Amino acid sequence: LLKKDGLKTSSVGRIFDALSSLLNICDRNSYEGEAAILLENRITSYVIDNCASYLEVLEDGIISSQALFKNICRDLLSGKPTEKIITNFFYTLAKLVFTVAERNGIKDIALSGGVFQNACLVDMLYELGNDNYNLYFNRELSPNDENISFGEIMVYLNRKEARFYEIPERIQKFK
């Protein structure tokens, strides 16, 4: 993983799986999302000001899983508690959402997929972006991966037509 080009995936869920395995929490999912749930269950509390990001810089818009896991392994080998590593991982993901949004001039962020059922991650997103961003989550459509395609269709239609569609009423701001 740390030699060659790193883990290549477009699914954050697979990165949750890899971290869970690295931390000896779950090597094989017996159901979809098990590793992510077990990671989340390890977090009993956190203070956002005490969190540290494993990734500070995005190079050419690419998020380096190699750098992510190199920094996680550094903390693991130094004896940092598992719970702190997991908390910093969630914090890293939350910070990345806003880093990408800022680089692209986006203030309205729609979050979908199984990863955004993680209560700790969602709490961090609200804490970090509460005043500067509008966060949207599924209310009537399933938040699981099967509805990521809905967002992809909206992006495609907006780019193809060079105009923005109104967000349907059923997808309302969740605060």
What are these model-derived regions, one by one?
Residues K3, S10-R14, D131-Y136, N158-F164:
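Short, Lys/Arg-enriched charge-dense amphipathic segments
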Residues D108-S112, A119, L125-I148:
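Conserved phosphate-binding/catalytic loops in two-lobed NTP-binding clefts
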Residues D17, N24-C26, F116-Q117, E140-P143, ...:
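Short, glycine-/Ser/Thr-/acidic-enriched flexible segments
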Residues V12, G113-V115:
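A short acidic Gly-Thr/Ser loop motif
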Residues L22, R103, L128-Y136, I153-K160:
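Hydrophobic alpha-helical segments
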Residues L1-D108, C120-Y126:
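A contiguous, well-structured pocket-lining segment that forms one wall/lid of small-molecule binding clefts
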Residues E83, F90-Y91, K95, Y136-K175:
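Glycine-rich phosphate-binding/hydrolytic loop that grips phosphoryl groups
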